[in-house]
């Protein structure tokens, strides 16, 4: 479907435009891009008539500073952080009249990139919209702005590009099927930003490995790889389990973790960052191979002081997203270019990504890494972070259990006592549910242990989507969930070391928060754990199935 980057660079160098597509989970659009030095009146007119979007001039920050072109706004609230400067026309003494004609806009572009042009040679505002590209290009930000500058630079031309969003004739945004046809119709090369990132990853780097050291921890034996970002001199680390020489031969379990001083170091209960970090390290130790990439982007990218200001607003009743927006920031300012280069340095090709955040998947796909599996990371809520976790699920789209189906406790022979043993079992349980919408969430709360017993592996099965309305889910005729749960339980009871299995039906809400003072209990044998039994189960009853039939989950 997509053309090779080398072929696109040849066309850029020859003065032609190319169609550039970003990730479907980002802007999900295609832009027509050409090198700025080849922006003729005819090409500008083609963009205006056949692409129909806003015509912009992507330039380096250094050149925009020379021209004294500040950002259009001091606080950018655009979700993709597109960095518009004030708009411009070439000054009248340079031959521009209204500024809007194709000839005037082409002339303004040529004046802007001319090294002898001074700030007073440009009128403000105008009809060309300069965009400030991030230093580091698409390796720093996977946007069309950076792609335009990178393509021009890689083609050996002046590092500036003209871009225009491609719209359909009816004014709607052209998506990939329309963009494929558009490129075919006008004989244009079609490339993706993901491929451009991969191309640059093969040819240049902005990450430098500084040192490696042993890292014994309470979670296991690891190695720390320290890196420096050569663009901004920030320091980051990779916490590595196993031999990196083996990373290129198999999918590697990876966690991208952004620094959280209050959570990671100070144990804050307002977020789940520390619990996520610790859970990820335990998973790596159990798996024996993997990486936690620890990125220095505090407060989802807004910095420590601004994060604390957001906390102050949360104290007044705002949620985490509203607080960021109140301060003039998007909900999430993080980017994963540095982390992608660190993984590339370690030889990682395929990723089993530990995340609940769809933006991380979109961001890493944009950096040329193949994500073969998403491994959920579900964290226990507390009185302080429960609203925070709910907001992440509802407003940031995180994959967290929103609706609980049942709580399960399993007793094994011998007992599963250590953290490593629990994670081994949970990995096998997650594997049983792979390919289904069902999610697993371990529960270590005292109320769950009191209910099921301290030697039990306790977890919830639930969904990150809404339950069908009407009947209880286990009796719903047109819902897929009863059959999925039946199959899951039947597979569980076949494990040879499983002694007893107990569960409590839920109807969406966390069953540990809706327990009655007195619960019914039914103890039966594994032989009675059939597909038909599900229809008879009731809430507020603990059902225990065992090989012997006594079923009591003892050893409390």
From Swiss-Prot:
The protein's matches in InterPro entries, at most eight in alphabetical order, are given as: DHBP_synth_RibB-like_a/b_dom, DHBP_synthase_RibB, GTP_cyclohydro_II, RibA, RibA-like_sf, Riboflavin_synth_RibBA
Residue numbers spanned by region DHBP synthase: 1-202
- Residue positions annotated to bind D-ribulose 5-phosphate are 26-27, 31, 141-145, 165
> Which pathway does it serve?
Cofactor biosynthesis; riboflavin biosynthesis; 2-hydroxy-3-oxobutyl phosphate from D-ribulose 5-phosphate: step 1/1; Cofactor biosynthesis; riboflavin biosynthesis; 5-amino-6-(D-ribitylamino)uracil from GTP: step 1/4
Annotated cofactor note: Binds 2 divalent metal cations per subunit. Magnesium or manganese.
**PANTHER family from the UniProt entry:** 3,4-DIHYDROXY-2-BUTANONE 4-PHOSPHATE SYNTHASE (PTHR21327:SF18), GTP CYCLOHYDROLASE II-RELATED (PTHR21327)
Family per UniProt? In the N-terminal section; belongs to the DHBP synthase family. In the central section; belongs to the GTP cyclohydrolase II family.
Q: What is this protein called?
A: Riboflavin biosynthesis protein RibBA
| Organism of this sequence | Synechocystis sp. (strain ATCC 27184 / PCC 6803 / Kazusa)
């Amino acid at each position: 479907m997509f053309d090779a980057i080398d072929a696109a660079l040849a066309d850029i160098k020859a003065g032609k435009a190319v169609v550039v597509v970003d990730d479907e989970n980002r802007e999900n659009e295609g832009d027509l891009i050409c090198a700025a030095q080849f922006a003729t009146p005819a090409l500008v007119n083609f963009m205006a008539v056949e692409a129909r979007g806003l015509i912009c001039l992507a330039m380096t920050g250094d050149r925009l500073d020379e021209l004294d072109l500040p950002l259009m706004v001091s606080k950018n609230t655009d979700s993709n952080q597109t960095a518009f400067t004030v708009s411009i026309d070439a000054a009248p003494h340079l031959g521009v009249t209204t500024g809007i004609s194709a000839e005037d806009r082409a002339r303004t572009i040529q004046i802007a990139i001319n090294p002898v042009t001074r700030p007073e040679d440009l009128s403000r505002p105008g009809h060309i919209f300069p965009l400030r590209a991030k230093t580091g290009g698409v390796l720093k930000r996977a946007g069309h702005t950076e792609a335009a500058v990178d393509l021009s630079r890689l083609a050996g031309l002046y590092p500036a590009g003209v871009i225009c969003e491609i719209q359909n004739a009816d004014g709607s945004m052209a998506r990939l099927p329309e963009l494929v046809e558009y490129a075919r119709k006008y004989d244009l090369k079609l490339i993706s930003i993901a491929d451009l990132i991969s191309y640059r990853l093969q040819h240049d780097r902005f990450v430098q490995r500084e040192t490696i050291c042993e890292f014994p921890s309470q979670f296991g034996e690891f190695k720390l790889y320290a890196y420096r970002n050569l663009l901004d001199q920030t320091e980051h680390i990779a916490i590595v389990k196993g031999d990196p020489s083996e990373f290129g031969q198999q999918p590697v379990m990876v966690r991208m973790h952004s620094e959280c001083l209050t959570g990671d170091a100070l144990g804050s209960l307002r977020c789940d960052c520390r619990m996520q970090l610790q859970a990820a390290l335990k998973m790596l130790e159990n798996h024996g191979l993997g990486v936690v990439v620890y990125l220095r982007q505090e407060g989802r990218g807004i910095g420590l002081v601004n994060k604390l200001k957001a906390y102050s607003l949360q104290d007044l009743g705002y949620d985490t997203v509203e607080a960021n927006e109140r301060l003039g920031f998007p909900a999430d300012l993080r980017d994963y270019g540095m982390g992608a280069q660190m993984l590339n340095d370690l030889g990682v090709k395929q990723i089993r990504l530990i995340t609940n955040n769809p933006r991380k998947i979109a961001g890493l796909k944009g950096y040329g890494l193949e994500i073969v599996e998403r491994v959920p990371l579900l964290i226990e809520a507390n009185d302080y972070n429960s609203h925070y976790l709910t907001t992440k699920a509802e407003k940031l789209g995180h994959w967290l259990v929103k609706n609980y189906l049942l709580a399960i406790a399993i007793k094994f022979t011998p007992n599963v006592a250590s953290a490593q043993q629990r994670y081994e079992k949970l990995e096998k349980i997650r594997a049983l549910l792979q390919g289904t919408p069902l999610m697993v969430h371990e529960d270590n709360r005292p109320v769950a242990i009191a209910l099921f017993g301290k030697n039990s592996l306790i977890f919830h099965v639930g969904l990150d989507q809404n339950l069908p309305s009407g009947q209880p889910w286990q009796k719903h005729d047109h819902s897929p969930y009863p059959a999925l749960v039946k199959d899951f339980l039947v597979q569980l009871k076949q494990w040879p070391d499983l002694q007893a299995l107990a569960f409590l039906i839920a109807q969406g809400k966390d069953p540990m928060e809706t327990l009655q003072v007195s619960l019914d209990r039914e103890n039966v044998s594994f032989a009675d754990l059939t597909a038909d039994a599900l229809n008879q189960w009731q809430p507020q009853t603990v059902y225990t199935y065992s090989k012997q039939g006594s079923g009591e989950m003892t050893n409390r």
